[in-house]
Amino acid sequence: MRRLTDSFILGLAKGAVIPGLYPFRMTEGRSSLEQIGVVITVAISFLLTFKKFDPRFYKPIGDFKIVFLSLMAAKLPSFLSAVVMICLIFSEMRLRMILSRCVLIMPSYSPAVFTGMMVSLFFKSQMFDDYSVLTTTAFLLPFTLRYGWMIRSSGFLISLQKYRPILKSTSFREVDLKYLVKFTVEFLLLFTILWIGKIFLSMPKSNHLFFLTVVNNVFFKLNVFKAAACAMVAILSGLMMNVCLYRIIFEAFLGLGFSSIMLTLSSDLKDRSFYAGDLLNGFFCLVVCCMYFGV
């Protein structure tokens, strides 16, 4: 029962933290230079998550406070708001990195994690925009309070011994280069189709919560190339008939393609000596950046 509860708590927190969501919203109507500045900030904060880190000594209360105060201050004048958003993105990236590692390191139930994420994502819909500060902090609070007990569990400490930081010199020697090339090609294919869809389907400004839910699917996998082909058919159909249904179909198949890659990475690399959680976190952040930037 405790494992089930902890898994649900991790899912709530993962769904509440979408790195870059609020900073990318700030780029609407801004100059190209300002947009480039946001992307650079996101990239730097992402790279900093790869530094040497021991989850046993992490205290999430610091990032929790920053996220809460940053969201509270989001309506400040533009310059101050930009400074606040920089602080927010750094904390979001770190929280997401911690959560990605914990989900893989700690014994957890994937369906419970997914259910928690769906609950959090539902409350990020536009009907709850006025309560975004309340809902985000409410879903992060259980993880913040529970983290200390989680990492002291025997299962966590035993599993932690298998892992080393991703930048260890011996980490990538254990991975077949052809294996990484295959995933890189699949990443690039889906990212290219995503940008094509954004250009030709006139995707509206929204939270894309349906897409994010499908991306985090843990129940079944679809061949990436089949998913890409179906997404292209949806784009062509949307060009001929401007119906929102095709945008939904496009996001569904594209999300299934991304989730298939993440599921394969999670299952194949989980027992390797480096943090598969770092790869999954980086992949998710790239997907968010590609989907939200410039929409």
UniProtKB/Swiss-Prot annotation:
Kindly list the residue ranges recorded as spanning the membrane.
33-53, 66-86, 103-123, 131-151, 183-203, 218-238, 243-263, 274-294
Q: Give the way it sits in the membrane.
A: Multi-pass membrane protein
The organism's place on the tree of life at top rank = Viruses
Its principal location?
Answer: host cell
Q: Which Pfam families match?
A: Herpes_U26
What InterPro entries does the entry give? Herpes_U26
Any one of the GO CC terms: membrane
Cellular compartments annotated: Host membrane
Which keywords fit this entry according to its UniProt record? Host membrane, Membrane, Transmembrane, Transmembrane helix
Protein name (database record): Protein U26
Q: Which organism is it from?
A: Human herpesvirus 6B (strain Z29)
Give the gene symbol.
Answer: U26
